[in-house]
Amino acid sequence: MTELLSREEYAAIAATLDLPQRAFIDGGFRDACGGRTFASTNPATGELLAQVAACDAEDVGHAVASARRAFEDGRWRSRTPAERKAALLRLAELLEEHLLELAVMESLDSGKPIRECQHTDLPETINTLRWHAELIDKIYDSTAPVGSAALAMVVREPIGVVGLVLPWNFPLLMLAWKIGPALAAGCSVVVKPAPETSLTALRVAELASQAGIPAGVFNVVPGGGREAGEPLGRHPDVAMVSFTGSTATGRLFLKYAAESNLKRVVLECGGKNPAVVMNDVEDLDLVAQHVVNGAFWNMGENCSASSRLIVHAEVREALLERIGAQLREWRMGDPLDPRNRLGALVSPAHFEKVRAYLDQARTERLAVRFGGATEAGIFVEPTVVDGVSPHSRLFREEIFGPLLSVTSFDDIDEAIALANDTVYGLAASAYTGSLRHALRLSREIRAGIVTVNCFGEGDASTPFGGYKESGFGGRDKSVWAHDQYTELKTIWIDAS
């Protein structure tokens, strides 16, 4: 792990950055066909970073055509597994060589604390690419038991051109979660980053070219959802879209697929994730540490954030006191200051959305136990709101900011009912000193990821995705991610 630098050293790196501004199509940078651009700004300061190419349907068409040519002529998919593996491992090496550059770029573009970009996002991005690269030559096809008169093979083939639509909260990491298995499988990709955070995806595309990934295999079209996302979702030569973002936008991609070529759609959408704390926990200080990290890491801009604390009434007050003590250690401020654990929210529009929920808490006359204030710019203190009922908007709606709602219960049946009282089902955490309670909570909570006595999402080897309106169609990460980027084919050879 690279050592953190001083704020001044990060600022010096920022001053030397050559920020990418144009779309990356067919192996090189190019302006948007219409010549339009949009402003990429630093959320912490409002400062203009770059005028980025604003792609539209024409640009998407060029990118898809480039990807389709690359797929059809086999310049990538026909390479041996060892050759694709070598290129992806080289890309991971290049990301490591440019780690500080990419970490600073990510922090400037997203408002994320540099300590998280450098010590979490970049290492996990690099590890994800290496993990999928190493998996390439360890996936076997199979034969079916049909007798000696025939040979029946069941094989997987790359699905084709894939549209990868990224969120703004983890631009680099979500890029790796998707390009890792997609490129490993032999697909060609067209990446549509969020307009709020387009810069690092463009830089990674450039590094991918240097790593030996052929022209046309890795394309990036920055732009808005209607202008670039919808044309990608509707394009007849796109075989699949993998989307991470809001449930509302996920529904649109299902519509685009239904109204075009019935392309495969994999959705990873929202979450309103519970942290259930039983009264038999052994270490409330440790529980408080995990709850605070789960709720406020990345400013709560995390689809798997533990935004609902569901706590047994007997330990509620003691736990809240410890949460308050933990929060005193969470500094908020300049994202390039490595002492800060909380940076700016991603945009003024998102800041106003989060602030509206703070106002809602006051309207409902709920107890704001900690935080609740905003600071100059678009900074929001980590906020804990107590006494939240299951009917409150704070309990039911995904806020995607540093706001933790607190609801108490009296027995495990009530806890499970509260945990499942949501349209989402992405993640959950359970804290208990009882193996019996741990097994029951982890089995009965309807979520794709359940952690016990910790907060997390597993590592690259474990699938990430959810139930209900949190998405469907596949999973990010792990060996299961590879399946969704392939088609299953049966080959029957009559040997009689």
From Swiss-Prot:
Entry binding sites for NADH: 166, 168, 192, 246, 249, 256, 269, 353, 398
Active-site residues per Swiss-Prot or TrEMBL entry: 268, 303
Cited PROSITE patterns: ALDEHYDE_DEHYDR_CYS, ALDEHYDE_DEHYDR_GLU
Broadest EC class assigned to this enzyme: oxidoreductase
Reaction(s) the record says it catalyses: aminoacetaldehyde + NAD(+) + H2O = glycine + NADH + 2 H(+); 3-aminopropanal + NAD(+) + H2O = beta-alanine + NADH + 2 H(+)
One Gene Ontology MF term: nucleotide binding
Alphabetical list of Gene3D superfamilies matching this protein: Aldehyde Dehydrogenase, Chain A, domain 1, Aldehyde Dehydrogenase, Chain A, domain 2
EC number: 1.2.1.-
Site (described: Important in defining aldehyde specificity): 457
Keyword annotations from UniProtKB, A to Z: NAD, Nucleotide-binding, Oxidoreductase
Pfam families in the record: Aldedh
Subunit structure: Homotetramer, formed by two symmetrical dimers.
Family note: Belongs to the aldehyde dehydrogenase family.
Purpose of the protein: NAD(+)-dependent aminoaldehyde dehydrogenase highly efficient with protonated aminoacetaldehyde (ACTAL) and 3-aminopropanaldehyde (APAL). Likely participates in a still uncharacterized metabolic pathway present in proteobacteria species, in which ACTAL might be an intermediate, yielding glycine. Highly prefers NAD(+) over NADP(+).
Alphabetical list of PANTHER family matching this protein: ALDEHYDE DEHYDROGENASE-RELATED
Protein name: Aminoacetaldehyde dehydrogenase
